[in-house]
């Protein structure tokens, strides 16, 4: 808004991923609608377009706009020039075109414009690859894109099988998960952001724009339970291609914690000293240092998602099963190693209870699938190792004095004294997943007592501000490359 103070409200157009920002002033009301056009599944025509439509709802509104693109995170130069259709920004790293009917002026590497809208009028701005020219920016053309995109999202969401009391929240969550999918490959990224801090002004600003095996598996759980089997099938295809080229030799194992959407290795983590993240939070990072970590828990999350896909989706192929057996063979030889686990600590590997839990899940689910489908496997070895894992978790992961399962197995080195309860017993919220993965039952008397005590301890620890997540406060050493909690809602088997 060009003149005066404005009140802002932001929301999604109902049952869509069209973002609406409403600005209210004494002179009128204007809406800014941001969306990526999507008119049909696998819509190649609009894959790299971002549309911003400004609509005056009431009054007469003077507006200003500006665009300041930076190539290669501000490390590559570019030149801006005015064009008949708007402006173009070109350099060695690529070229962008801003198409609009609003007159623009170029100032250095940026472009600006002023315009006034009366009630019922609109202006559109379309940002896309300069090599593409996928349509005009007239009011009618952009209206067609808007209506088509709204229809697509509502049609997609109509496939949801959820009709409970939390419909609005569940559907908003699954719409977000859909935004994180890469349709050409089937990959599911963890988040579309970098430079978004855990705390405003803090240092923990990570690059999340990759496929974390763990997070993608959690997303798959949610999609399957809601009835979106096509997305689950596409991710399983991505995973199958990944396993086909996985190397099972070496201590690093056949799986990495994270990959690019193409299934390739993630770049080295680089600090962008010249840039700031959200609200001045610095430093910004590109790439992710967790790429070389050993995170044994991902085998459990991955195989559990395959188990659910086999149960609710199309079912896995024999070829995919043989790949999983190869994966499991490696895990059976390495499951008792220290690792960085779900919290991706950078202070050295530990014997994490959560990793043992998910290794148990991996073997237990393979046994289930083999029996249910009659698939071949070394069930004797699998079950013996599974039972060894179970005993270790119960005997070394439980602290009787603290009344809780602990983050690390005994004997272990716990330096985080201020985060400990009952001596060396550091509480880990990830272990609250135990009943969800069928390790313990909160209703069967033999195991419910431990579970209830552990849950109560976790609740007390969290409410007293001592973190239940992991080694966060002491010598942080960039302890975790992410802050997302496990998306565990809807875990039912």
Predicted features by range, described:
Residues 1-493:
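Acidic, mature catalytic/reactive cores of soluble proteins
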């Amino acid at each position: 808004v060009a003149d005066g103070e404005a009140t802002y409200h932001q929301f999604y157009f109902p049952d869509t991923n069209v973002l609406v920002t409403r600005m209210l002033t004494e002179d009128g009301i204007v809406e800014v609608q941001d969306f990526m056009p999507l008119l049909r599944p696998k819509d190649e025509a609009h894959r790299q377009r971002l549309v911003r439509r400004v609509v005056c709802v009431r009054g007469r509104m003077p507006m200003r706009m500006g665009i300041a693109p930076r190539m290669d995170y501000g490390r590559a130069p570019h030149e801006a020039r005015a064009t008949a259709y708007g402006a173009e920004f070109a350099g060695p790293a690529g070229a962008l075109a801003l198409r609009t009917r609003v007159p623009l002026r170029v100032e250095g590497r940026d472009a600006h414009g002023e315009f006034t809208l009366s009630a019922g009028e609109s202006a559109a701005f379309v940002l896309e690859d300069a090599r593409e020219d996928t349509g005009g920016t007239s009011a009618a053309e952009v209206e067609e894109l808007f209506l088509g995109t709204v229809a697509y999202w509502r049609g997609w969401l109509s496939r949801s099988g959820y009709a409970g009391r939390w419909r609005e929240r569940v559907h908003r969550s699954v719409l977000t998960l859909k935004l994180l999918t890469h349709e050409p490959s089937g990959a599911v990224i963890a988040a579309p952001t970098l430079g978004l801090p855990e705390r405003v002004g803090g240092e923990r600003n990570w690059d999340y724009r990759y496929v974390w095996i763990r997070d993608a598996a959690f997303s798959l759980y949610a999609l399957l339970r809601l009835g979106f089997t096509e997305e689950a099938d596409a991710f399983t295809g991505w995973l199958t291609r990944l396993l086909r080229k996985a190397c099972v030799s070496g201590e690093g194992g056949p799986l990495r914690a994270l990959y690019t959407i193409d299934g390739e290795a993630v770049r080295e983590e680089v600090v962008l000293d010249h840039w700031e993240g959200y609200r001045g939070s610095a430093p910004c990072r590109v790439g992710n240092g967790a790429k070389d970590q050993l995170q044994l828990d991902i085998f459990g999350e991955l195989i559990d998602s395959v188990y659910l896909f086999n149960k609710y989706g199309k079912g896995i192929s024999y070829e995919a099963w043989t790949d999983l057996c190869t994966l499991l063979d490696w895990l059976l030889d390495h499951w008792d190693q220290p690792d960085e686990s779900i919290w991706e600590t950078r202070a050295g590997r530990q014997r994490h209870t959560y990793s043992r839990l998910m290794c148990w899940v991996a073997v237990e689910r393979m046994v289930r699938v083999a029996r249910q489908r009659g698939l071949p496997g070394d069930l004797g070895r699998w079950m013996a190792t599974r039972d060894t894992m179970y005993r270790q978790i119960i005997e070394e992961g439980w602290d009787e004095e603290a009344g809780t399962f602990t983050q690390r197995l005994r004997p272990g080195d716990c330096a985080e004294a201020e985060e400990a309860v009952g001596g060396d017993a550091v509480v880990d919220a990830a272990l609250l997943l135990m009943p969800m993965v069928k390790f313990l039952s909160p209703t069967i008397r033999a195991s419910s007592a431990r579970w209830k005590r552990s849950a109560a301890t976790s609740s007390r620890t969290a409410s007293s501000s001592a973190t239940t997540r992991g080694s966060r406060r002491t010598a942080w050493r960039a302890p975790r490359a992410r802050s997302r909690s496990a998306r565990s809602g809807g875990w039912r088997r």
